């Protein structure tokens, strides 16, 4: 046996057992004490960075990542937070109409960031008897193209905080194909240049939130991984928790380094069209009618039937959202709601010309780069707004109409050196929206129009 032991060698350096102090055996391999010392030195060198500071393990990395991403921007204070009236005035410059929704948003956002400033002063943490302030997330209900995303984006611009938009339709419950809910936080972190402290004061807008409603009012015995399952996964994030976010996105795994983000200071604004919600409200209003009122056979009284959809939604209650498919726990974490009105043709006209980034101003700026002055007649603006209203896609239809209308013009004008001014008339809009090809006027015709 001793003879056999004399032939044992280190699998790394090849020294025999007699040449080293200790030889440690493994499953079919051996390593000596000298090789162990060498490996320790190599690891020590790897764990020291270029500045001579020791590096940390993966668990410490998660903590140090949070600590190292200190925000270069100061935290909000009570003196720097804009007042509700100031917030609404800023929204008025960018968003046309929606007065009630602006008022609700202004107060909710002011209270949220006032709460952050109060916690930042330490008043809410040192005094155990002090009242603890909880955040109130916001639910925006309105048809497509009415300004839900623009309102949230404008708020983030005013407050100078990171802003991220997430699509609820791509989210699935953990363990299924699709995006985890933590990927929403990753988008916000990327907008903040991976600055955790700055990201924790940001705003996340979750669009198409109505698409994750469960398919029936009664709880299903089968798994709804993209509906009720997503609502369950979002509960803690909306309420406030420390979430582990993978820096590279995708699914999490146990051995992955994660960045920890506290969501208790992040304002979540959820928006959706909620098509058919007005019918749910009208059915409830019809059932609550007192006396023998004429009915249309669908549980709605004649008086309630004559209400517009937007007017009906002003009578919205939490029970209506439950019947629509949102679970009560989810609704309870979004206590503030605002209903946005559908845009009429008059509002669409204002959107074309009044806001800072109005479409007429955008296209005028584009053509001014080619030394061409672009003008829209008031009748032309009215015709564009009427066509957009007919298409039933809100303000999004305006850009599509103008892009189609200006295609030939923007194709030819850069090559025309003698054209200095162009006026869009109602006749041109009517010809285009009627399906006819809009020819670009000849040089003589343009010159004649300009001189007239």
Swiss-Prot record:
Source superkingdom: Bacteria
SMART domains documented for this protein: AAA, ClpB_D2-small, zf-C4_ClpX
Residues binding ATP: 143-150
PROSITE patterns cross-referenced by the UniProt entry: CLPX_ZB
A Gene Ontology molecular function term of the record: ATP hydrolysis activity
Domain ClpX-type ZB: 1-51
Protein keywords: ATP-binding, Chaperone, Metal-binding, Nucleotide-binding, Zinc
Binding residue positions for Zn(2+): 10, 13, 32, 35
Cross-referenced InterPro entries: AAA+_ATPase, ATP-dep_Clp_protease_ClpX, ATPase_AAA_core, Clp_ATPase_C, Clp_protease_ATP-bd_su_ClpX, ClpX_bact, P-loop_NTPase, Znf_CppX_C4
SUPFAM superfamilies: Glucocorticoid receptor-like (DNA-binding domain), P-loop containing nucleoside triphosphate hydrolases
Ranges where the record places region Disordered: 50-79
Known function: ATP-dependent specificity component of the Clp protease. It directs the protease to specific substrates. Can perform chaperone functions in the absence of ClpP.
UniProt family annotation: Belongs to the ClpX chaperone family.
NCBIfam families from the UniProt entry: clpX, PRK05342.1
Subunit relationships: Component of the ClpX-ClpP complex. Forms a hexameric ring that, in the presence of ATP, binds to fourteen ClpP subunits assembled into a disk-like structure with a central cavity, resembling the structure of eukaryotic proteasomes.
The protein's name: ATP-dependent Clp protease ATP-binding subunit ClpX
Native organism: Prochlorococcus marinus (strain MIT 9303)
């Amino acid at each position: 046996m001793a003879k056999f032991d004399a032939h044992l060698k280190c699998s790394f350096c090849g020294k025999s057992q007699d040449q080293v102090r200790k030889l440690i055996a493994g499953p079919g391999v051996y390593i000596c004490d000298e090789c162990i010392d060498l490996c320790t030195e190599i690891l020590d060198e790897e764990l020291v960075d270029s500045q001579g500071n020791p590096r940390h393990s993966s668990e410490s990395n998660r903590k140090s990542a949070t600590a190292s991403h200190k925000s270069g921007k100061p935290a909000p204070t009570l003196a720097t937070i804009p007042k509700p009236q100031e917030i609404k005035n800023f929204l008025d410059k960018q968003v046309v109409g929606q007065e009630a929704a602006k008022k609700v948003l202004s107060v909710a956002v002011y209270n949220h960031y006032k709460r952050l400033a109060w916690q930042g002063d330490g008043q809410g943490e040192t005094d155990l008897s002090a009242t603890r302030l909880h955040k109130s997330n916001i639910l925006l209900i309105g048809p497509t193209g009415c300004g839900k995303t623009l309102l949230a984006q404008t708020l983030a611009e005013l407050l100078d905080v990171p802003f991220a938009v997430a699509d609820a339709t791509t989210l699935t419950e953990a363990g299924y194909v699709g995006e985890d809910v933590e990927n929403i936080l990753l988008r916000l972190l990327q907008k903040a240049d991976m600055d955790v402290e700055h990201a924790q004061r940001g705003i996340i807008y979750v669009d198409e939130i109505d698409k994750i409603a469960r398919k029936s009012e009664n709880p299903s015995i089968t798994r709804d991984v993209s509906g009720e399952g997503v609502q369950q996964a979002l509960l803690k994030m909306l309420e406030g928790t420390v979430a582990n976010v993978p820096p590279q996105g995708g699914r999490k795994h146990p051995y992955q380094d994660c960045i920890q983000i506290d969501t208790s200071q992040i304002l979540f604004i959820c928006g959706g069209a909620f098509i058919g919600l007005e019918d749910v409200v009208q059915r409830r209003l019809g059932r609550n009618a007192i006396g023998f009122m004429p009915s249309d056979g669908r549980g709605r009284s004649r008086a309630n039937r004559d209400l517009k959809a937007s007017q009906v939604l002003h009578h919205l209650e939490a029970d209506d959202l439950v019947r629509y498919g949102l679970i009560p726990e989810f609704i309870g974490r979004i206590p503030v709601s605002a209903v946005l009105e559908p845009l009429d043709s008059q509002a669409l006209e204002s959107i074309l010309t009044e806001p800072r980034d109005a479409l007429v101003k955008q296209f005028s700026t584009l053509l001014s780069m080619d030394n061409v002055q672009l003008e829209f007649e008031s009748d032309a603006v009215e015709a564009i707004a009427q066509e957009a209203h007919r298409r039933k896609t809100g303000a999004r239809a305006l850009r599509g109409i103008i892009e189609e209308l200006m295609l030939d013009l923007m194709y030819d004008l850069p090559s025309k050196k003698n054209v200095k001014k162009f006026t869009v008339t109602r006749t041109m809009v009517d010809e285009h929206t009627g399906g006819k090809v809009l020819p670009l006027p000849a040089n003589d015709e343009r010159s004649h129009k300009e001189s007239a």
